[in-house]
């Protein structure tokens, strides 16, 4: 697939690619069906947009974005997991997410922890936040990391907030996420192949 995707990017073709076995959480077939490196690999191809929407509502916006593309291929990653539609703190999230990321759970402007999460890890982060008492936790859905990083610094700071600690949650390799955290222990990623089910 990679050679044809690269040619589509070079040719500025608005192809849409769907990746169905996203994440390491499913896949009784083991590491052959757990694409831990795919997110990073797709993000590094020039002129390719890679979307990893968190729930069904984000997926609808991702489809809109893909259909609006006129000069680059769009890749969307979906999972076989059952993901619930969650409430969004940002009431204008449908527009904000078009800049790559938006706030799902607010916390405050000065959260103790900001969790940057993608796809099924957004719901996982929301559930994890419920288990932590006494902490002000902001959760951000990063549907398009590359697009988010193209935004001006003030927007990025507004989304991440003045958190004492930033944590990343993505079911893939940590490549490209290191700059957001102060310690590797805050990377909830996987830098190895999975195991058989």
Annotated model-derived regions:
Residues 53-61, 65-69:
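Conserved glycine-bearing catalytic or ligand-binding loops at nucleotide- and phosphate-handling centers
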Residues 12-15, 47-48, 164:
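Short glycine-/polar-rich loops that comprise or flank the Walker A/P-loop
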Residues 15-19, 49-53, 73-77, 137-140:
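Acidic/polar loop patches that form or flank catalytic/metal-binding clefts of enzymes
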Residues 21, 56, 143-145:
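Residue-level "edge-of-site" marker
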Residues 1-40, 58-61, 68-197:
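Thiamine diphosphate
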């Amino acid at each position: 697939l990679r050679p044809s995707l690269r040619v589509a990017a070079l040719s500025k073709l608005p192809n849409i690619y769907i990746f169905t076995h996203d994440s390491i959480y499913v896949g009784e077939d083991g590491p052959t069906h757990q694409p831990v490196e795919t997110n990073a690999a797709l993000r590094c191809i020039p002129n390719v947009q890679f979307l990893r929407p968190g729930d069904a509502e984000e997926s609808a916006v991702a489809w809109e974005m893909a259909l609006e593309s006129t000069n680059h291929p769009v890749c969307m990653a979906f999972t076989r997991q059952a993901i619930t539609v969650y409430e969004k703190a940002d009431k204008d999230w449908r527009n904000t997410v078009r800049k790559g990321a938006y706030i799902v759970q607010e916390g405050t402007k000065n959260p103790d922890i900001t969790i940057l999460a993608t796809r099924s890890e957004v719901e996982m982060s929301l559930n994890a936040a419920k288990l932590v008492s006494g902490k002000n936790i902001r959760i951000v859905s990063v549907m398009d990391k590359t697009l988010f990083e193209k935004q001006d610094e003030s927007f990025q700071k507004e989304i991440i907030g003045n958190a004492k600690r930033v944590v990343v949650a993505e079911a893939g390799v940590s490549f490209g996420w290191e700059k957001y955290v102060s310690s590797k222990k805050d990377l909830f990623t996987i830098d190895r192949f999975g195991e058989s089910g």
